[in-house]
Amino acid sequence: MVKKQHVAGQLARQFHKVSMAHLQADDARDEYAMAAYQGRMDAIREEVSWHQASCGAGALMQLGAAATIVDQAVDRLKPCELMALKRLIVSLAGFVEANSNDRRSDFDRGYLGI
């Protein structure tokens, strides 16, 4: 049985697999597969926000979800607020990396958002 506190880490691993499959579909120019994988990545980003991070990968995934939300709210934020939020997210990601074995480079940074 899956413990609730480990869900964010499992979602991070799923996200990594799906993002790698998305890149392969992109290389193969398979638009249908790319759209399907993009939908799955968006769903995982939404799902991860409901769970507590219990590992570095889960925390990075949650920071990636936060970065995506910030990017979607860019037209509602002052430029100084936008830059401050981005700096905070990157700073927290650096803290997670310094205190865990997980790295942003373990993910496709274009999809993680940080």
Where are these regions (language model features)?
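Sequence/structural signature of long amphipathic alpha-helices
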Residues: 1-114
